[in-house]
Amino acid sequence: MSSTSSHPIPGWAAVVADSLGPGPHVVVTGISPSGNIHVGNLREVLVGEAVVNALKAKGEAVRFVFHADTIDPLRKIAPGVPKDYERYLGHSLSRVPDMEGCHDSYAEHFLGPFEEALRRMEVEVEVLRSHELYESGFYAEVTREALEHTGELREIL
């Protein structure tokens, strides 16, 4: 395991960084904040952070993004969530009210404490919420482009 001045670089992360072409790079991780966020979700971020640190150690420009899929629908009722929340099944997590009233939405109820944990761990990551990206029109151009090239995309996929 090599390291930069403050971050150890696991060997596998260095291999990943070495396999990438020249930057700039964007490393994206993410989850759907539909229930209590756990150590498995944290692993998602820490794997990305290891690759980011390996790229930085090589002098590469890199942007680290955590994508919170807040537009995902509520698919099931998480432990501790009132049973009457079944009425919100199928609704966007960003539009379901917070059951305790302490956050703006169901998604934020679970995402907020996770973001705080990342801050306390000094993980430097840009958190993006999918519902905000959609509402801002961020995906409009790429969606148009994808629709114009569906045949080519089918061949690739």
Residue ranges of predicted features:
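Active-site neighborhoods of enzyme catalytic cores
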Residues: 92-157
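Short, solvent-exposed loop/turn segments at secondary-structure boundaries
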Residues: 39-42, 77
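Short, solvent-exposed turn/loop segments enriched in Gly/Ser/Thr/Pro and often Arg
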Residues: 65-74, 130
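Non-catalytic terminal extensions that flank enzyme cores
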Residues: 1-39, 50-66, 86, 90, ...
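Non-catalytic interaction-recognition regions
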Residues: 41-45, 49, 63, 132, ...
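Charged, often glycine-rich, active-site loop that binds/positions anionic groups
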Residues: 71-88, 142-143
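Short catalytic/ligand-binding loop motif for oxyanion handling, primarily in non-cytosolic enzymes
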Residues: 35-36, 72-75, 135-138
